[in-house]
Structures are given as C-alpha cells and as structure tokens.
Amino acid sequence: MLKRDMNIADYDADLFAAIQEETVRQEEHIELIASENYTSPRVMEAQGSQLTNKYAEGYPGKRYYGGCEFVDKVETLAINRACELFGAEYANVQPHSGSQANNAVYMALLNAGDTVLGMSLAHGGHLTHGSPVNFSGKLYNIIPYGIDEAGQIDYEEMEALAIEHKPKMIIGGFSAYSQICDWARMREIADKVGAYFFVDMAHVAGLIAAGVYPNPVPHAHVVTTTTHKTLAGPRGGLILSNEGEDLYKKLNSAVFPGGQGGPLMHVIAGKAVAFKEALEPEFKEYQVRVVANAKAMVAEFLARGYNIVSGSTENHLFLVDLIDKDITGKEADAALGSANITVNKNSVPNDPRSPFVTSGIRVGSPSITRRGFSEEDAKNLAGWMCDILDNMGDESVIEATKAKVLEICKRLPVYA
C-alpha cells in the first residue's frame, strides 16, 4: 500500500544526495544560461501532484479513456489562460517540449522535402529551424538566412531568398539573437511568396506576455514556445494560432496522435499555474527588470573592451564575441564556472571554431533577475566576469570572484 509519508531520502540515499547537490548548486551558483529560469513552488507543487497518474489521450471532451472529467478542467484552464496571455484564439498545451511543438508544426503544414527558410544556427537560430543534425534539416530542404554586418536580421536577404527558393514555410525566432524581430516584415515576405509564417518565440515568450517585446501572434500563421525560459513555468511546449479552425485541427492532429500519445497532465497543471502567474502585474515588472539587467551587463562588457554581437541587447540575452581576445567559448565557460558563474559556450557569426569549442559565450538575465538582482548587481557581475576573462588562468582572481558570488547568492537566495 502506498503511504503519503514515503520519501526519497529514506528510500534512495544516492538519488536524494544527487538532488540535494543540485539544490545547493542552484543556490550557490549564478545562473546565466539564457534558456534557464527558476520556476515557482506553485508550479513544482502541480508537477508533484496525483495528476501524474492520469492517462488522458485526446483533448478535453474527446478523450480515449474514462475518468478524465477533472483533468479536462485542468487542461481547459491552461488553454484559456494561454490564449488570454498571448491574445490567441487557439492554444495546444500538450507538447512535451518546444522541439516537439515545432515538430508538430512541420507535420501539420509541410510534406517531407518541402522548402523551408529558417535562421542559420550559426547566426542565432535553433536546431529545429533547419540544422542538418536535426529532424528539420534531415526531412526538409532548408534555406538559411542570417544577420548582416551590423548584427541585425537581414530582411533584404530573407526576401531575396524567399523569392528565389519559394519556400512553403518561413521561420522567425531564435536561440541567440539579441535584437527586436520585425514580425510584420516577415509576414509580408511570407505572403509575397505564398508561404506559411511560423514563429518560434521560445526565448522571449515571457517578455512578450508582459508586453515588453513585440507579439508575433497577430502576424504569424502559427506560434510555438517553450513554457520555461523567460516564461518561468515548467519544462514543456505550447502552440498558438489565430488562423482558423482548419489549421487548428491540423495542429491538434499533429500533436496527438501524430507525434505524442498521452499528455503529461501534471505538467499541463504546472503550465496553467505559470500562465496565471504571468497574467499578474508583478510578472510585467519582472520582465522589465530582465531587460534592464541584460542591458546593464552589456554596458559593462562594452566599457571593459569586449565585443557584443549586434552591439547591444533588446531582450534577455546577448553574445560575447571572444575572437579578438583569443579565448575560446569552451575556455571561458570553464573559467567562469570555476567561480560559480554558469554560462554556455556559443558560436558567434562567422565563428572559425567548431560548435564544441566556439568563440563566444551566451549570457542571459532571467535567472539572476528572478532571484532579485538589481541593475547595479548585474553591472557588478559583468565586471567580475571581465576580471576572470582578463586574467585567464589566475586562480586568485577566480577565488576572489567566487567569494563575491557566494556572498550575493546568500543575500539573494533562489527560494527564500
């Protein structure tokens, strides 16, 4: 018989120790990976609920199993809140991840071999936008577009490529681009060649929900996102659209039964909580601070003589180009990690090094802002990072910086 006082600590000491170690790491490290965030205890409560036991293939009111009347309520709450949050008529909250949401869009709108215009991974795109190692690059004819010498999306190139190649779908969105996307211009280009316009807003969904970054939903045929990152919910995916019932039916079928079986009802409950949190005024205030902190960090890096791809940031992330410093992204990642500052190595435009080494790092502000960093804190943090990068291999600098990191982490805990 199952008892509610069963716990991991008493039963599986090895697993419990690993979980505790990760808990300590999160509290004692500064998290700057742009795709990570801290979700609320309310979201974690939902994910640890008995909803995890329920199979619910299908959609609310149209399930293949009985006993779904209450999980129908949960999913309907998530759907309605997602639509309200982003101004959408349709939402599918079942994708297990952003990549699976993207896969569903491909399946719904395209046939294998169709031509797709997507942002080059080397210029800030995502694996699912056409990388040859991903399903998108293996199954479809991908034409990449990129950024110009000023670090802005080259819309003239995009339009010329669209006219030349006549893609069936054009993808907007990114994983490492720090500027504002002109969704209206992209839709104009798509309409000019009769293509679907699909936006993956995973990185900026929280900013969009708060109104501090342009919303693609009014412009795109279909929009996807993750529900973590800037949105700060559970790890999962979401599909949105305003383009009519025919498209909604295709998207639903592409998710289930096309790509997934039963939805993760405990995660959908977590999404419902996160969407409610994102509708609160405090969430907008948080997102405003996210952008302000990223800008404060960029200003300090520039003042210290570092190159920033695109020269600035208008969202939550930026890329530090280390080519002229003769430091690899891999080396910078490791050095900063030694001081309890977590970033990720990242390719920069025209990077001469492999994706496993790279010549840059990607820096994001959602997590530090979530734990209460001010603009002054963010500026100081960028300075500490420059200290380490200016003195690669100097253990005294690393140790001094680590002490500062531990002090601010103690002052600003993730979970107070």
UniProtKB/Swiss-Prot annotation:
Binding site for (6S)-5,6,7,8-tetrahydrofolate: L121, G125, H126, L127, E245, S354, P355, F356
Source organism superkingdom: Bacteria
Required co-factors: pyridoxal 5'-phosphate
Keywords annotated in UniProt: Amino-acid biosynthesis, Cytoplasm, One-carbon metabolism, Pyridoxal phosphate, Transferase
Residue numbers bearing the N6-(pyridoxal phosphate)lysine modification: K229
Location(s) in or outside the cell: Cytoplasm
Pfam families the UniProt entry points to: SHMT (PF00464)
GO biological process: glycine biosynthetic process from serine; tetrahydrofolate interconversion
The enzyme's E.C. designation: 2.1.2.1
Keyword Transferase on entry: yes
Reaction it catalyzes: (6R)-5,10-methylene-5,6,7,8-tetrahydrofolate + glycine + H2O = (6S)-5,6,7,8-tetrahydrofolate + L-serine
Keyword Amino-acid biosynthesis: yes
Pathway annotation: One-carbon metabolism; tetrahydrofolate interconversion; Amino-acid biosynthesis; glycine biosynthesis; glycine from L-serine: step 1/1
Site residues by UniProt (Plays an important role in substrate specificity): H228
CC annotations in GO: cytosol
One annotated GO molecular function: glycine hydroxymethyltransferase activity
Main location: cytoplasm
Assigned protein family: Belongs to the SHMT family.
PANTHER family given in the database record: SERINE HYDROXYMETHYLTRANSFERASE (PTHR11680:SF50)
Subunit organization: Homodimer.
HAMAP family found in the cross-reference section: SHMT
Function text: Catalyzes the reversible interconversion of serine and glycine with tetrahydrofolate (THF) serving as the one-carbon carrier. This reaction serves as the major source of one-carbon groups required for the biosynthesis of purines, thymidylate, methionine, and other important biomolecules. Also exhibits THF-independent aldolase activity toward beta-hydroxyamino acids, producing glycine and aldehydes, via a retro-aldol mechanism.
Protein name: Serine hydroxymethyltransferase
Protein source organism: Aliivibrio salmonicida (strain LFI1238) (Vibrio salmonicida (strain LFI1238))
Gene this chain is encoded by: glyA
